[in-house]
Structure formats: structure tokens, C-alpha cells
Amino acid sequence: MTNDLYAVVGNPISHSKSPRIHSLFAQQTGEAVEYTAIQAPLEDFAGTVHHFFDHGGKGLNITVPFKEQAWTLAEHRTHRAELAGAANTLYLDQEDQLVADNTDGVGIVRDLRDNHGVPLKGARVLVLGAGGAVRGVLGPLLDEQPASVVVANRTVARAEALARLFGREHSGIELSACGFEQVEGPFDLVINGTSASLKGDLPAITADVIRADTVVYDMMYSLQTTTFNQWALDHGAVRVFDGLGMLVEQAAEAFFVWRGVRPETSAVTEELRTD
């Protein structure tokens, strides 16, 4: 029996953990899946996608810098992809129409709620950043019914635009926006959705957003403690998590969308930590 073909598309892509994750899922579930990494030319993402599906490919994951292009390219979008304005998962429906989905938000919610036991319902949440990473996760976070969510960003107008967009769908939740300097804590949960940790930088917020019982979550991940999580630990936080679990959970949701089988994730996350 031949394996069904899947891949992750990005540029650059050599660093991607997705092939490793999906090969572990395939081993665990017994699904006949072959999963590779494809570096698409920056100027021809669409051609790369069409070539993949024209040659029998079954599904794609999409990473930077192509998530918005994937959303635009699709003929149909799931509701969560529509809200996210970006897609990290593509597949063909029964009519061979390209469908865009976004599993990032489900990924962070499952990691926080199920893997780390973080209560989201009724929580006071601070989300740092207003780019594509944050837009991709806000909908599923709000679906968990936190008491309030503050979106803080260097450019306040971008945070305000997100608050307006998601406020229409979640009118029962206090959703507000501000600049980094205007944040007033403390919070039950602080999520860093900026890429500052990758550059060794920090968002310009003060430590009063953190109490000892504040959960801090950096959507970036690394072998060492991320810059943001180290800052949080230095200012009294006890529970800090990086985004590796989110990466595995969003991959598991994509696997489920494609195959109808939901892989078990904790062993895969542990294996990646020790790779």
C-alpha cells in the first residue's frame, strides 16, 4: 500500500519540526502517511501548492511567510480560518476544491487547558502582540469564556482592530486594546504572541502584570528557557511554558482534519524536548 503524501511549506523550512511530529503521529496511529518539508520560492507559493495537489498530495501545513497567501488561495475556508485571516492547513474537499483551515488556536487552547491544567474560563488574560500569530489564536481563546482579554501591542491601532473584529463574535467578554506601556496588571494568564524572544528582546511591559500565581506562556519555543519566560521567572512567576506543546497540538488537529484520527500528543512533545 502506498503512503498518502503530506508536507509543510515555508521559506525557510529546514528548521521545521513538522516532519518529525507527523512521522511520530503516523507511527503511533498506524496511518499510511508520508510527510516532507517543501521550501517554496517567495514569489511562487501558489505554484508550489498547485503542483503538490496536482501530483496527488493530500494535505499541506503552511508556515511563515505564507499563511496569509494560503488563506487567499483557498476556494473555501473554515470558520476558524475565516476569523484568523490566515491558514496553516490546506486540503482538497470531495469536489477537489481547496479548503483552508487554521489549527493554531485549538493548539494553544489544548496545550494550556489539557496539558498544563490552566483554567481559561473566567480568567483575566493579557495577550502581547497583534500580528498574525495572535489573530490566529484569539478566536479559540475567547471561545473558552475568559472574564476579560487585553490585547497589547506596540502599534495600538492594530490591537484595537483585533479587539473590534473579535468583539463582534464574543460580545459577552470584556475585550480591550492598549499599548505596551498602558498595560495594568496583574493577570491570571499572560501570553506572549510577539516574536521578541527570537531576537532576545522583550515587549515593553512592566513586571506588575505578573503575580506568583500568574501563568506565563510564550508562543515561541527553544531548547533553553525563552527570553520572555526567563524575564517572567525573574519577576516572580512560577509556571511558565513555551510554545512547543502548541506546535504539537496544532499538528495533531491538522492530522485529525486530514485523517479523522486524533493522535496522542504528550509522548510526542516529550520526544521533541529530548531530540
From Swiss-Prot:
NADP(+) binds at residues 129-133, 153-158, 219, 243. Its EC number is 1.1.1.25. Shikimate binds at residues 16-18, 63, 88, 104, 221. The keyword Amino-acid biosynthesis applies. Belongs to the shikimate dehydrogenase family. The gene is aroE. It catalyses: shikimate + NADP(+) = 3-dehydroshikimate + NADPH + H(+). Pathway: Metabolic intermediate biosynthesis; chorismate biosynthesis; chorismate from D-erythrose 4-phosphate and phosphoenolpyruvate: step 4/7. Involved in the biosynthesis of the chorismate, which leads to the biosynthesis of aromatic amino acids. Catalyzes the reversible NADPH linked reduction of 3-dehydroshikimate (DHSA) to yield shikimate (SA). PANTHER family: BIFUNCTIONAL 3-DEHYDROQUINATE DEHYDRATASE_SHIKIMATE DEHYDROGENASE, CHLOROPLASTIC, SHIKIMATE DEHYDROGENASE. InterPro entries: Aminoacid_DH-like_N_sf (IPR046346), NAD(P)-bd_dom_sf (IPR036291), SDH_C (IPR041121), Shikimate_DH (IPR011342), Shikimate_DH-bd_N (IPR013708), Shikimate_DH_fam (IPR022893), Shikm_DH/Glu-tRNA_Rdtase (IPR006151). GO terms for biological process: amino acid biosynthetic process; aromatic amino acid family biosynthetic process; chorismate biosynthetic process; shikimate metabolic process. Keywords: Amino-acid biosynthesis, Aromatic amino acid biosynthesis, NADP, Oxidoreductase. This is Shikimate dehydrogenase (NADP(+)). SUPFAM superfamilies: Aminoacid dehydrogenase-like, N-terminal domain (SSF53223), NAD(P)-binding Rossmann-fold domains (SSF51735). GO terms for molecular function: NADP binding; shikimate 3-dehydrogenase (NADP+) activity. Homodimer. It comes from the Bacteria. The active site is at residue 67.
